[in-house]
Amino acid sequence: MKCHYEALGVRRDASEEELKKAYRKLALKWHPDKNLDNAAEAAEQFKLIQAAYDVLSDPQERAWYDNHREALLKGGFDGEYQDDSLDLLRYFTVTCYSGYGDDEKGFYTVYRNVFEMIAKEELESVLEEEVDDFPTFGDSQSDYDTVVHPFYAYWQSFCTQKNFAWKEEYDTRQASNRWEKRAMEKENKKIRDKARKEKNELVRQLVAFIRKRDKRVQAHRKLVEEQNAEKARKAEEMRRQQKLKQAKLVEQYREQSWMTMANLEKELQEMEARYEKEFGDGSDENEMEEHELKDEEDGKDSDEAEDAELYDDLYCPACDKSFKTEKAMKNHEKSKKHREMVALLKQQLEEEEENFSRPQIDENPLDDNSEEEMEDAPKQKLSKKQKKKKQKPAQNYDDNFNVNGPGEGVKVDPEDTNLNQDSAKELEDSPQENVSVTEIIKPCDDPKSEAKSVPKPKGKKTKDMKKPVRVPAEPQTMSVLISCTTCHSEFPSRNKLFDHLKATGHARAPSSSSLNSATSSQSKKEKRKNR
């Protein structure tokens, strides 16, 4: 089969106008009517010209023909494809050449012809405008920089320009629809890409095989190694000479007299001696240093004192708690628990102050104390539990009064009854007075109640709020004198009084008025409880 471009005598990139002019010219030349002497040959040529123009004048037919031109020329799709390209596999052996000379079977001649044939095949598959200059292999005397190096640089990254259309399995012209045509084109493209990749790898492997055995490359590599070794030797020689030069400079170096440090300490001592002789022995400086040390110590002490003051400012003595910040201290001072503890502490301190200030107790101490405590007691809201605690000592007082009165026949004066009534009233207001009243009125037959001054609170929440206020030890040293109403004898304690009453029989029954007042007060308290 003849190429259509050759039949029309045009280039492969010819335009439509050029194709039309060439067709008309050849048609007039080979038309059978104008070649009567050679009608058969003219008819055959005219058919080829007409077929070529029919294909190339159609853009789609021309594009398909350009892609499959080599396959059609070498057998096409109708018959078996005859690949007449160079077989590169037989050049991967040393038996294909003999020696490294420039003769016909020498190394350089054989492989030079191989790469010239590969370049020719590439030129046939591309347009003239796209032709690149293929570097030649050269001979045994070729220069490395101008011939050998450019050759290997190009062919080691070789990419073929062939489209390998003869490898396609499907003829897209036979597709019934466009979807089937696209599927055929996709499969054909995969096959062409695979064949192109195999061709590129085959050529690159052949180049690597040749380069490994090329004497010119080996000679250049040896030359480069020698040059590198020479450069390293020169660099080492320069370093050695530099070291020798520095060693000579060190030997020639002489230290100046003003740079020596040997006599520096001696000179400093002499200077100090001169200054001491002229200005003194330096005691003032020592004193200054001592003063500075003292100032530093005083500063440390003052800092510690400030820290202690800061700690004292954030400490609550009533609740026995310390705080880290002023805000926490202020919040604590606003709490109900703190106010209650402050009131109890204030009351305790006032009582201690009164006990220390008065060496003797008046005839009616309960009346005076109760009046003063009623005036000085802080007015604050108390919880229900605290009110109940206050009412219990009053009931104990009434019970003791009833038991001791008729059972033992103790005589009670009207003054005592008045005292009991006043103390019962005071019990509702001050928890501290419960202690004093029960200590004076309770009989000694109940030693357990005598030991307990204030009932012990229970529970975690009321543990701090209801701490018992202990009676200070000093008032116990000042004994309260108790007198017998019959013989007016004074006793230091209630036990002594009751021993006297049992021994002498001076006990008298309480009057009816006092009993009535005691029972009435008890009934009122029971009513309050029932509420």
Swiss-Prot record:
Region feature Disordered, mapped onto this chain = 279-311, 327-474, 502-531
Tissue localization of expression is: Expressed in brain, placenta, kidney and pancreas.
**Bias (Low complexity):** 511-522
Question: Which segments show compositional bias classed as Acidic residues?
Answer: 281-311, 364-375
Chain intervals with Basic residues compositional bias: 381-392, 455-464
Q: Where are the transmembrane segments?
A: none
GO MF annotation list: RNA binding; zinc ion binding
Provide the disulphide bond pattern: none
Q: Kindly give the SUPFAM superfamilies that the UniProt entry links to this protein.
A: beta-beta-alpha zinc fingers (SSF57667), Chaperone J-domain (SSF46565)
What ranges of residues constitute the C2H2-type zinc fingers? 314-338, 482-506
Report the residues modified as Phosphoserine.
Answer: S283, S302, S370, S511
Composition bias (Basic and acidic residues) maps to: 442-453
Q: Where is the composition biased (Polar residues)?
A: 393-403
Which CDD domains does the record cross-reference, listed alphabetically? DnaJ (cd06257)
InterPro entries (UniProt xref): Chaperone_stress_response, DnaJ_domain, DnaJ_domain_CS, J_dom_sf, Matrin/U1-like-C_Znf_C2H2, Znf_C2H2_jaz, Znf_C2H2_sf, Znf_C2H2_type
Question: Where does it localize?
Answer: Cytoplasm; Nucleus; Nucleus, Nucleolus
Which Gene Ontology biological process is one annotated for this entry? Answer: protein folding
The entry describes its oligomerization and partners as: Interacts with HSPA8, PA2G4 and ZNF622.
Q: Which disease is it linked to?
A: Bone marrow failure syndrome 3: A form of bone marrow failure syndrome, a heterogeneous group of life-threatening disorders characterized by hematopoietic defects in association with a range of variable extra-hematopoietic manifestations. BMFS3 is characterized by pancytopenia with onset in early childhood. Some patients have additional variable non-specific features, including poor growth, microcephaly, and skin anomalies. BMFS3 inheritance is autosomal recessive.
Record function comment: May act as a co-chaperone for HSP70. May play a role in ribosomal RNA (rRNA) biogenesis, possibly in the maturation of the 60S subunit. Binds the precursor 45S rRNA.
Its recorded name reads DnaJ homolog subfamily C member 21
Q: Which organism is it from?
A: Homo sapiens (Human)
Q: Which gene encodes it?
A: DNAJC21
